[in-house]
From Swiss-Prot:
The gene is cia1. This is Probable cytosolic iron-sulfur protein assembly protein 1. Belongs to the WD repeat CIA1 family. PROSITE patterns: WD_REPEATS_2, WD_REPEATS_REGION. CDD domains: WD40. Keywords: Repeat, WD repeat. PANTHER family: CYTOSOLIC IRON-SULFUR PROTEIN ASSEMBLY PROTEIN CIAO1-RELATED, WD40 PROTEIN CIAO1. Pfam families: WD40. Residues 108-154 are annotated as: Disordered. The lineage of its organism: Eukaryota, Fungi, Dikarya, Ascomycota, Pezizomycotina.
């Protein structure tokens, strides 16, 4: 019997839903999906954060005035009722806390948040410095008002707290699962943990400063459930941190990447690197670790280590240049990666009788034209008037040209 040719459209692929408009005219670093609303916050070199609707893909609000240089990172605080709380990190070496009441979010107009609506470049250190200098020159030019009538909304964002302590650019911010702790990391090689005292006066207290990394710390990420922190660095390592008797310390150091580790994500750990690889790491049960486990040679065991992590797999290699970001879907378990080659790659884990295998489901080359893609995130959205329970998951990517694109997965 002759083989049946399936039309290309029937194969698993990514399909562009929309660009978020209007975009920033400068480099966009990262997109942070809101934990419960169909909105995202994007971080730009023009010192602003833009908040967009994933229902109609339009700009809802522009947050500005808190940082003196590029906004590199942002994260929404979880488990907040009645308002949205956003943490930001900037090249000006500070982190900021922004607040906005959500009471108007139940409206049905396009302006509402309502649920039923609407790095580097082998970004090596020298290249990242050059990018930062370019950002500064751009910021000295005339600023662009892209708010499209959102000025009234902008006034409702309150710059509540400035967290000052790092000596250099803040590269990543991340809230703990409880929302009571905020981790920040910096080019100064340090990781800070701040506690939200939740006293009604916007007070934060520094509870730990960790300086074991030997290079720029690119990313921090919390375990989805436990108060366990992972960090990734220019020193090619991933480090795991826990609190013991009110003292935070390193409990594991993962080695295996042969270049800067840019990003971390997921319930296990998925990491990506300058070495063009994406790797998955798994924590061994304590009983197995105590018995000796498999003794992966890529794992160092610092003094007092109470956890053993092993490299579970290296995903199929697709990227030709540095991989800057990975995202693990909570809904489907799919992984997405992006990087300097402009590709979006989707991977799926397939459980076999003997071993687990990761396969490539889709590759979208040139997703942002000739530009490098700095970040990728999975986000939930629903069309206007659609039942929220039927919301879909989309992929949001940000790039050097300032564009933010929303893709849907077809046949995945």
């Amino acid at each position: 019997m002759a083989a049946v040719d399936h039309p290309a459209s029937s194969l698993p692929h990514l399909q562009l839903l929309s660009d978020l408009t209007p975009p920033s005219l400068e480099r966009t670093w990262l997109t942070a999906p809101h934990p419960r609303l169909p909105i995202v916050a994007t971080c730009s070199s023009d010192k602003t954060v833009r908040v967009y609707s994933l229902t109609n893909f339009r700009l809802l609000s522009t947050i500005s005035g808190g940082h003196k240089r590029s906004v590199r990172t942002a994260a929404w605080k979880p488990h907040v009722q009645g308002e949205s709380v956003l943490a930001t990190g900037s090249f000006d070496a500070t982190a900021g806390i922004w607040r906005r009441w959500d009471s108007y979010g139940q409206t049905t107009g396009d302006e509402g948040w309502g649920l039923g609506q609407e790095t580097t470049t082998n970004k090596s250190e020298s290249q990242e410095e050059q990018a930062q200098e370019t950002d500064i020159l751009r910021q000295q030019q005339a600023t662009h008002n892209e708010n499209d009538g959102a000025d009234d909304e902008d006034e409702e964002w309150r710059f509540a707290v400035l967290l000052d302590g790092h000596d250099s650019e803040v590269k990543s911010v991340s809230w703990s699962p409880s929302g009571m702790l905020l981790a920040t990391c910096s080019r100064d090689k340090s990781i800070w943990i701040w506690e939200d005292l939740d006293d009604g006066d916007n007070n934060f207290e520094t509870v730990a400063v960790m300086q074991e990394h030997e290079g720029d710390v690119k990313c921090v990420a919390w375990h989805p459930v436990e108060e366990c922190l992972a960090s990734a660095s220019y020193d090619d390592t991933i480090r795991i941190w826990r609190e013991d008797l009110d003292d935070w310390g390193q409990v594991a150091c993962l080695r295996g990447h042969e270049g800067t580790v840019w990003f971390l994500s997921g319930p296990r750990i998925v990491s990506c690197s300058d070495d063009r690889t994406v790797r998955v790491w798994r924590r061994q049960p304590k009983e197995q670790a105590a018995a000796g486990g498999t003794g992966m040679p890529s794992i160092l065991r610092p003094t007092g280590l109470d956890e053993t992590w092993e490299e579970e797999t290296v995903l199929p290699k697709v990227h030709d240049l540095a991989v800057y970001a990975v995202a693990w879907s909570k809904r489907t378990g799919l992984l997405a990666s992006v990087g300097a080659d402009g590709r979006i790659v989707i991977y799926e884990e397939r459980l076999g009788v003997v071993r687990t295998e990761w396969v490539i489901l889709a590759v979208l080359p040139g997703a942002h034209g000739i530009y490098e893609i700095n970040h990728v995130a999975w986000a939930n959205r629903a069309d206007r008037d659609r039942d929220v329970s039927k919301e879909e998951e989309v992929l949001v990517t940000t790039a050097d040209d300032g564009s933010v694109k929303v893709d849907e997965t077809v046949g995945l």
